[in-house]
């Protein structure tokens, strides 16, 4: 077995239960996607599997060497590229040996990995990270470069088990294609969290995490969606039938009460005409009321049962919340000049090389709509920071009008 999850639960510090009683076995070499609504605990589950978080109860086991690519990298700021890749100690030992220090501890640390530098440079080149120093701080890389670095480490380490949390985030087209190819050909056990349908369709099994636990489907994402739709339609039909039955039960109970009231009124009038003594009339009335009460209780129990079944069905229906973004119209008139850039360029403190071989010149006006596209590390985020004033160009000038932004 490669991944075993047994009776696993996790509770937030505010006592809110995120998930409970999770059980799952992923056999060696299997490739599985973990899906579910935002906030259901997918990332927390992978962090527990990676040993970066502790469960409330239960246990997890991952066989062999495990490699984890997180969704966010802030916790690694302050580390160098070599430290992130986990090769800094080996490199130190290698350089010490090459410089004549033959202490036994260096050989033990290197562990006969004499071509560690060559292998590292090869995977960095494959992930379009050639030219990046192994001593460069992680925070000096773009979001896409950070993702590529962790994925390069995945190839460098050749692990038995891979945990990938949103690995296509920040990746450009070329980076995504390389990831798809790697996932397709690797023999490692793979567990992936992603919203990338192309990646999800490469995986032959889907496990959905929800408030009801883990439900697994034998098939890729398209198959999973089809099965979910069939299941949802069946639940919806059951719900409609139960709601119809509830309306009928309430109508029947109401009609019975009305009919009983009319019968009681007619019975009392008839008894008075026949001269039945009041004491006997009271007994007959009590008997009728008891019978009516028992019948009402039967109908009430039936109605309550149907209502509970409806509640359970509604709870079983998958959530279909959809993201909707509505930007209010700008108060600025169309065509107002917001940003004017003249021959701007930028380089970070740890580099003397400009981001762009040709300086950028452009003008932004209110009402314009632009899409900034480019490879990872081409400077898209840096350009936005220059536009908003978060960064200052190291060359050229940029002028900004007073405007708000998100």
Please provide the spans of the model-predicted regions.
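A short, flexible loop at the N-terminus of ABC-type nucleotide-binding domains that lies
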Residues: 1-5, 9-21, 130, 334-336, ...
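The feature captures the beta-strand-to-loop junction immediately N-terminal to the Walker
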Residues: 35-37, 373-375
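Catalytic Walker B motif of ABC-type/P-loop ATPase nucleotide-binding domains
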Residues: 162-166, 171, 179
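ABC-family P-loop ATPase nucleotide-binding domains
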Residues: 75-140
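Helix-to-loop junction immediately C-terminal to a conserved catalytic motif
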Residues: 50, 388
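ABC nucleotide-binding domain "signature motif"
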Residues: 56-64, 214-215, 394-404
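Conserved hydrophobic segment flanking the Walker A/P-loop of ABC-type ATPase nucleotide-binding domains
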Residues: 26-28, 348, 356, 362-366
């Amino acid at each position: 077995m490669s991944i075993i999850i047994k009776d696993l639960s996790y509770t937030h510090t505010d006592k809110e239960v995120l998930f409970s009683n999770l059980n799952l076995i992923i056999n060696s070499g299997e490739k599985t996607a973990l899906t579910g609504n935002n906030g259901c605990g997918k990332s927390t589950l992978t962090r527990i599997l990676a040993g970066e978080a502790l469960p409330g109860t239960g246990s997890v086991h991952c066989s062999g060497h495990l490699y984890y690519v997180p969704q966010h990298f802030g916790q690694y700021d302050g580390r160098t590229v070599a430290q992130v890749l986990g090769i800094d100690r080996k490199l130190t030992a290698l350089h010490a040996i090459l410089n004549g220090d033959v202490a036994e501890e260096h050989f033990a640390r290197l562990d006969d990995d004499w071509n560690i530098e060559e292998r590292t440079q090869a995977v960095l080149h494959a992930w379009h990270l050639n030219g990046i120093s192994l001593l460069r701080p992680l925070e000096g890389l773009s979001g896409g470069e950070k993702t590529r670095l962790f994925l390069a480490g995945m190839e460098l380490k050749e692990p038995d088990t891979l945990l990938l949390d949103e690995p296509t985030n920040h990746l450009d087209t070329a980076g995504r294609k390389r990831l798809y190819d790697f996932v397709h050909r690797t023999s490692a056990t793979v567990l992936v969290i992603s919203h990338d349908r192309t990646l999800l369709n490469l995986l032959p099994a889907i496990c959905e995490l929800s408030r009801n636990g883990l439900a697994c489907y034998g098939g890729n994402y398209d198959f999973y969606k089809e099965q979910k739709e069939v299941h949802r339609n069946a639940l919806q039909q059951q719900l409609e039938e139960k709601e119809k039955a509830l309306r009928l039960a309430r109508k029947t109970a109401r009609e019975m009460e009305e009919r009983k009231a009319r019968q009681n009124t007619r019975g009392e009038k008839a008894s008075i005409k026949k001269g039945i003594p009041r004491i006997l009339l009271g007994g007959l009335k009590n008997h009728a009321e008891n019978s009516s009460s028992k019948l009402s209780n039967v109908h009430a129990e039936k109605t309550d049962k149907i209502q509970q079944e409806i509640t359970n069905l509604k709870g079983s229906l998958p959530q279909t919340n959809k993201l909707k973004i509505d930007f209010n119209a700008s108060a600025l008139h169309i065509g107002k000049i917001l940003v004017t850039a003249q021959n701007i360029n930028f380089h970070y403190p740890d580099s003397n090389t400009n981001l762009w071989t040709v300086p950028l010149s452009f003008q932004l006006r209110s009402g314009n709509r632009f899409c900034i596209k480019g490879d990872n590390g081409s400077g898209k985020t840096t350009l936005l920071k220059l536009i908003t004033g978060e960064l200052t160009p190291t060359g050229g000038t940029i002028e900004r009008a007073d405007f708000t932004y998100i």
